[in-house]
Amino acid sequence: MNQLNQFILIFLLLIVILFIFFLIPKKEPEIKTFAYEVPIRYSNPRSLYSLPKWKTFYGRNWL
């Protein structure tokens, strides 16, 4: 019985270690600034409507 308990403990520890190992490296990608995310011609507010919708949420002029 003691050996079985040891085996279960080691097995659980291994699972926890693997779980932590796979969880930590997955960080969310950083949001780049408006200047790098979008070409320079889009930084003009008049041409803002030519942006794809999700790109208007970043940076200086999202209306």
Curated annotation (Swiss-Prot):
Keywords: Membrane, Transmembrane, Transmembrane helix. It is a single-pass membrane protein. It is found in: Membrane. The keyword Membrane applies. The chain crosses the membrane at residues 4-24. One of its GO terms (cellular component) is membrane. This is Uncharacterized protein 227L.
